[in-house]
Each structure stands twice: as C-alpha cells, then as structure tokens.
C-alpha cells in the first residue's frame, strides 16, 4: 500500500507542476539598508551581484514609488553549514572551511533568486513584508509575479488560448505594494535560482528540504534588510500552500502575522489526480464532485441547468458529504438499486451519463472527467482551469493527455518574466530563466517528518504542520482562496482539510475563505484579480499589527 501511495503522490506532484506607471530602470539613489558580513571565502562560483532599480506604480489612484532589488541569497543544505555562509554568499573567514577543488564535490548550496519591492520613504518598522511563491513542486514564481501582484502583469485572454507573441505587458493597478513590501522567491533550481555542489538536487528537492531552504532564505532576508521587526506574511499558491503549511511550523524565531493559501492542497490523499492508485480511500471522489458540477454548469452540461452557481453547489456539497460519501464507503456492499439511484443523481449534477458512473463504480477521477465531459465534441476540458478546452489528442484514451489551460497561458508568462527581468530589472544576463526545475535527474523526495518526528510519511499530509503552527501562534490568521473551476486543487477539498485540522475549535475563527468564478490561477480573470487584491490587501492591513 505504501508503494501505491507513493506512486499516487508522484502523479499528483507531476500534475501540480504544471506592474500604474512603467518601472523606470536605473540605479536607485536611496538603496535599502543592507547588512554586510566581513571577510569571506568564495563558495563555488561567485554569485551574481544584486540589481537595484526604481519605479512607480499606481494602485487605487495613488502613485507608489518603489525600489526593486533582484538578486540571490545563498542557502546551505543544513543549519550548521548555513550558519557558516555569509550574506554575500561566501563562507565566513573564521569558518575554517577547506573546499574541495571541484565544484561538484563541494557541499550542496542553493542560490535562491528573489525580486524584492520596497515602498520608498516608508518606515520599515511600520511596513509589512510578504513573501510569495508558486508551487509545482519545482515551479518558478513567474505566475504570481507577472500575473497577480508585481508592478507589471501579463494579460492573457480569459477562458481561451493565448495567441502567439507579442504579448501585452501592462502596468498593474492591482499590485500589492499598497499594503506591503513584496518578495517574490524562486524555489531552488527554478527561475534564476541554482542548486550547486554534491548531491544538490537531493539536498533541496523534497518536502522537508524545500521548506528548510525557504526557512533559511527568509531568515537571511530579514537579516540582510533589517526587517525582523516588520509584520510578516507568506503567500503560497498550489504546492506553495503545502510548503506554507510546513514552513509556518518550521520557521525558527518568527511568529507570522498571516498565511495566505491560494488553490490549496495539504493532504495529497484528497487529490482527484490518480485516486484509483489508492483504493479504499474514497475522499477524492466526493470532494471532487462539487468542482465537477461547477465545471458542468459552466459548459452547460447540467440537465435542467440552474440559473445561479452557488445555490447549486450548496446542494451538491450536501449530497457529496451525505448520500454520495455513504454509498462509496459501503464498497461492495452497496445494493445495486442504490448504486443506480446514486448514479442518476450524479448524472443530474455532472451531465455524465448514469451508465458511465455505474461502469466507473461511482468513482471518476479528475483526469477521467476532463476527458469525458466534452468527448462528444472532440474536446478535452482543462484541469487547473476547467473553463478552458482544447482538441483531444487521443480520442480513445481514458484520461486527458494534457491540460488545455496550462498550454494556453504558459508561453505568455515565460516571455513576460524574461523580458521584464532583463529589460526592467536589468538582471539575468547570460543566464537562463528556468520556468521549472524539472529536468533529467529531477526527483522530488516525498518523505515528510510530521510534527513530533514519529517516523516518515509515505504520502504527503501537512495538515498537522499547519495545525501546530496555529496552536503555537494562536494570533496567526489564515486566509484560504481558490477557484470553483479547478479539478487539480479542489475548493471543497480545501475547505474539508481546514475543517479537519487537528486543533481546538476556537482556532477555526482564525481562518477566512473566499471563492472565485475562475480556476487555479484566479488572477487570469481581471475581475477576480481585483477581488484577490482587495481581499489580500485587507487581510494584510487587518493583521499587520501596525498603528
């Protein structure tokens, strides 16, 4: 069973992989306060220098002058090694390190790329700071940076495939600098981040290794920029929410003010990706049904189509946790007449024929659904955003072979970050920006030591991590957001996870929820981006603790 769990989690991880006034480039006149360490010894190749530029963005009618710093921080693979590395990316002179001659034999490090935006003229003690990252695992943070909260954003057609270049890169009136200074972080091996040294991938590519790297990065950043006394927030999307749960528990000496989770997955046993590989676990099926029903509603596949989505979903959710879950839990003991009645109800919610549901034993995965919903039209329905659709690749396959949404928007974001980083931030000369760390030799270590350290988990479930962080820091607030049209990270599954966190009921009041009529990346729809900005900026202001 453990092998089945690991295979299934690998499938889920593979599926998850998937700026008002123009920034004025130029050397800034008032650099942010930066600490510097003393003499040091070079660690591997010297890291690229920081690039400091300045600009202005208009949000809510107010011009915000800012300074942008694009650079890297060097992080060690263990706490002991990390403590020997200075802020300049070199070993401290008194560390007594004798490095092997060959870089590939030297201790593993990662140089984590970041872009930080600081509001000019603001008192850092009164200015919150938010650390943002996408997921994957192994994905760069170009999506949140160029699609949601940076000073520039890429515009892609909502619900349809983006045409080829040139792509419109516009001033972002929804930039989050109105509420907080921002730090966009590329995970080890992604973007301009690099992993170097002996067994570097093994040292940083894994559930716990990754969280440790972000922990060390954030503490280094707080030291370098003298921001230890600022209100602190983390914002993770997709697998970034998994990272945030572990990070919020793991980070040393930091009480976070708030955690924002966008398109959440904390327990991979709840995923609709490949649940057939974990028989006996029926949660993915009844947690996915509301997302499937929402998708069918969007594509007008629901018999007797309801006029409004939310009341329809409330009915589906009640059925999911009631009759549907009960039927699944009976397994082979479910009477045939009862199975037929459940299948007919499922047809009324999803448009998939009752006969199909019966053939599937009432259990349809996300990939099955994406393939079947519009099969008669020769179309595959999107996974991360089910409003999108594309031509079938293999009409005879059981599951969707690709995600039309991911295919629709990725090229635009890769283009945007490359142009913006090189032309506006003046960073990345002679370097390749890696949208993903996935390459020959990439392997993600699924092992996770849960709170208490009672052995290693074979499947990823970080609900205990977030619960422990909230118990240790009962003033920390959590905001959960997501889209209805997403079968990759289920909105109903995210709520289910939150309602089942192992913590006192009183702490449930620290969690707030917001859902959008979009998919995984809610910000591809401008109206949803506007709401996303409003919710996030309000959350930061309410929990920053500044006066």
Where is each model-derived feature located?
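Alpha/beta-hydrolase active-site loop
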Residues: 176-180, 187, 204-223
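Short alpha-helix in the alpha/beta-hydrolase fold that links the catalytic acid
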Residues: 247, 476, 490-500
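Alpha/beta-hydrolase fold nucleophile elbow
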Residues: 226-238
């Amino acid at each position: 069973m453990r092998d089945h769990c690991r295979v299934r989690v690998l499938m889920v991880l593979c599926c998850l992989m998937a700026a008002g006034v123009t920034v004025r480039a130029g050397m800034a006149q008032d650099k942010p306060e930066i600490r510097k360490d003393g003499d040091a010894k070079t660690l591997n190749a010297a890291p690229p220098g920081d690039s400091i530029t300045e600009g202005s963005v208009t949000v809510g009618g107010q011009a915000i002058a800012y300074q942008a710093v694009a650079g890297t921080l060097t992080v060690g693979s263990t706490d002991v090694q990390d403590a020997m590395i200075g802020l300049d990316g070199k070993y401290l002179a008194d560390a007594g390190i004798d490095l092997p001659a060959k870089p590939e034999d030297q201790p593993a490090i990662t140089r984590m790329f970041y872009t930080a935006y600081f509001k000019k003229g603001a008192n850092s003690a009164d200015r919150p700071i938010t650390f943002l990252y996408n997921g994957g695992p192994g994905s760069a943070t170009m999506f949140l940076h160029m699609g949601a909260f940076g000073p520039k954003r890429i515009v892609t057609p909502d619900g349809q495939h983006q045409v080829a270049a040139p792509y419109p890169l516009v001033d972002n009136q929804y930039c989050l600098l109105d509420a907080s200074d921002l730090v966009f972080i590329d995970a080890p091996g992604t973007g301009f981040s690099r992993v170097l040294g002996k067994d570097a991938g093994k040292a940083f590519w894994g559930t716990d290794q990754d969280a440790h790297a972000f922990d060390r990065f954030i503490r280094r950043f707080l030291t370098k920029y003298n921001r230890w006394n600022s209100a602190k927030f983390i914002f993770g999307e997709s697998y970034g929410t998994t990272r945030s749960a572990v990070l919020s528990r793991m980070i040393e000496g930091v009480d976070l003010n708030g955690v924002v989770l966008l398109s959440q997955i904390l327990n991979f046993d709840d995923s609709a990706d490949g649940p057939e590989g974990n028989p006996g676990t029926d949660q993915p099926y009844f947690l996915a049904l509301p997302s499937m029903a929402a998708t069918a509603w969007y594509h007008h596949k629901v018999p007797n189509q309801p006029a409004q989505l939310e009341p329809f979903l409330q009915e589906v959710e009640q059925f999911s946790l009631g009759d549907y879950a009960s039927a699944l839990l009976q397994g082979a003991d479910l009477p045939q007449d009862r199975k037929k009645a459940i299948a007919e109800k499922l047809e009324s919610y999803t448009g998939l024929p009752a006969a199909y549901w019966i053939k599937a034993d009432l259990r349809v995965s996300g990939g099955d659904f994406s393939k079947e919903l519009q099969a008669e039209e020769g179309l595959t329905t999107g996974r991360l955003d089910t409003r999108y659709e594309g031509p079938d690749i293999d009409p005879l396959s059981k599951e969707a072979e690709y995600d039309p949404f991911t295919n629709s928007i990725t090229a635009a974001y890769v283009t945007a970050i490359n142009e913006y980083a090189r032309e506006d931030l003046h960073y990345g000369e002679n370097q390749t920006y890696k949208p993903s760390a996935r390459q020959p030799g990439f392997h993600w270590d699924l092992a996770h030591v849960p709170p208490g350290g009672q052995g290693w988990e074979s499947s990823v479930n970080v609900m205990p991590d977030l619960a422990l962080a909230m118990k240790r820091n009962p003033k920390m607030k959590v905001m959960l957001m997501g889209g209805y049209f997403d079968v990759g990270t289920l909105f109903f599954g995210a709520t289910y996870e939150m309602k089942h966190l192992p913590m006192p009921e009183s702490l449930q009041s620290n969690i707030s929820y917001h859902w959008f009529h979009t998919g995984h990346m809610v910000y591809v729809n401008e109206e949803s981006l506007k709401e996303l900005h409003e919710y996030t900026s309000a959350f930061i202001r309410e929990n920053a603790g500044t006066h």
